[in-house]
Swiss-Prot record:
PROSITE patterns: HISOL_DEHYDROGENASE. It is an enzyme of class 1 (oxidoreductase). Pathway: Amino-acid biosynthesis; L-histidine biosynthesis; L-histidine from 5-phospho-alpha-D-ribose 1-diphosphate: step 9/9. The active site is at E325 (proton acceptor), H326 (proton acceptor). Catalyzes the sequential NAD-dependent oxidations of L-histidinol to L-histidinaldehyde and then to L-histidine. The gene is hisD. Keywords: Amino-acid biosynthesis, Histidine biosynthesis, Metal-binding, NAD, Oxidoreductase, Zinc. It comes from Prochlorococcus marinus subsp. pastoris (strain CCMP1986 / NIES-2087 / MED4). This is Histidinol dehydrogenase. Its EC number is 1.1.1.23. Zn(2+) binds at Q257, H260, D359, H418.
Length: 428
């Protein structure tokens, strides 16, 4: 982790961090994933089983988790944890219900009408990271908006551990969220199964959910066969702070991101020299006894940054350039600072709003754009699992009144048959 007090050097470092997923192995990874996808496309379940054994160490037979096992997982979950899952479920559901887009109709002066109609996709596939990890919150954040959208069938894939078991809490979250089918598979082969369909797994219309570089590459390659939510990179947090912020709290928030992944990025932009040093010291003090010490060290060492800025305006300028996935504003007046923020996936205001609040139960989705993509995209939501159609209806009068303009525009583009398709309707 570097401490930098030059705006220009800080900008250079932020750009380096933003490009941290760029790798010389991309061609090799693409080739591996392409081969896996092709095998799944042509050999279905046999290929899925083959690669699950190769990469995860077990044959997924049966591949699907039974409805009974899902219910049992919920029943066996600790009562306190069940309550927490239910609280999160209700808050996330309430927020996403407000996201449902409205269809509308505009009636023209001469009897014509145009409509926008929103409809859910029929089938959705959710990818939930697994193996040694367990992320029930990711189940909630993907399944709830799909359910709110009105998706008829939600299929979830998640890799099992070395014994082929999916974490009980992950299964409990799937049961609570109304996931219809759960399969004990992961990796690029699972993405291929969802995209192309197999005898056991129905082809889906949209795939959502985060994964490693192989999963992300698979999502990129199957886009066009099916829809995807986004191409998520490693997680990141940027904190804008002034001297009123608590240095220990900032250090904890930075490490809450670093513990995710060696490629996770934790950044502090502060107006205080003293605070910069205090946070630096506190970060390494906490790391010494951290249960994920090695991951934190790699993340902080390679992708951590503390930049000292002349004022909050400079902090905001650097933040907007970086476009962070998570942005915390811990200043004397966070709402005033917020007014100048242009690019961020999710924004957390004040010292009582650590990023973990958004990860678990605030309500907004925690699947957010990374690596600068917040400049042009936002979070996963209900619309991820919906599509819209335009419905257009003209009558004789409205077409006749507009015919001259349509014909003029068609002729300007050299499209004779377009123009003639209007003319012919008024010929005797």
């Amino acid at each position: 982790m570097k401490i930098i007090n030059s705006k220009q050097k800080a900008l250079q470092e932020l750009r380096r961090i933003s490009q941290r997923t760029t790798s010389g192995d991309n061609k090799k990874i693409n080739s591996i994933v392409e081969n896996i996808l092709q095998e799944v496309k042509f050999h279905g379940d046999i290929a899925v089983e083959k690669y699950t054994k190769k990469f995860d160490g077990f044959y997924p037979k049966p591949m699907q988790v039974s409805t009974r096992d899902l219910k049992t997982a919920w029943e066996e979950t600790d009562q306190h944890l069940k309550k927490s899952l239910e609280v999160a479920y209700q808050r996330i559901k309430k927020f996403h219900e407000k996201e449902i887009p409205e269809s509308f109709t505009i009636k023209g002066e001469f009897g014509d009408s145009v409509q926008r109609r929103w409809m859910p996709v029929k089938n959705a596939g959710l990818y939930i990271p697994g193996g040694r990890a367990a992320y029930p919150s990711t189940v909630l954040m993907n399944a709830i908006p799909a359910k709110v959208a009105g998706v008829k069938e939600i299929s979830m894939v998640s890799p099992g551990n070395e014994k082929g078991k999916i974490n009980t809490t992950v299964l409990a979250a799937a049961y609570l969220s109304g996931v219809d089918k759960v399969f004990r598979i992961g990796g690029a082969q699972a993405i291929g199964a969802l995209a192309f369909g197999t005898k056991q797994i129905n082809k889906v219309d949209v795939i959502s959910g985060p994964g490693n570089i192989y999963v992300t590459t698979a999502k990129k390659l199957i886009y066009g066969f099916t829809g995807i939510d986004s191409l998520a990179g490693p997680s990141e947090i940027l904190i804008i702070a002034d001297r009123t912020a608590n240095s220990s709290q900032i250090a904890s928030d930075l490490l809450a991101q670093a513990e995710h992944d060696p490629l996770a990025s934790s950044i502090l932009l502060t107006t205080s020299n003293d605070q910069a040093q205090e946070v630096f010291d506190e970060v390494f003090k906490i790391i010494e006894n951290h249960p994920r010490k090695e991951i934190c060290i790699q993340s902080i060492k390679n992708w951590g940054l503390i930049a000292i800025c002349e004022n909050l305006e400079s902090c905001v300028e650097l933040s907007n350039e970086f476009a962070p996935e998570h942005l915390e504003i811990i200043t004397i007046d966070p709402k005033t600072t917020l007014k100048s923020i242009e690019n961020a996936g999710a924004i957390f205001l004040g010292k009582w709003t650590p990023e973990a609040v958004g990860d678990y139960l605030a309500g907004p989705n925690h699947t957010l754009p990374t690596c600068g993509n917040a400049r042009f995209s936002g979070s996963l939501g209900v619309e991820t699992f919906m599509k819209n159609s335009s419905i257009i209806e003209f009558n004789e009068k409205s077409l006749k009144i507009n015919s001259v303009d349509i014909i003029n525009l068609a002729n300007s583009e050299g499209l004779h048959s377009h123009a003639n398709s209007v003319k012919i309707r008024f010929e005797d």
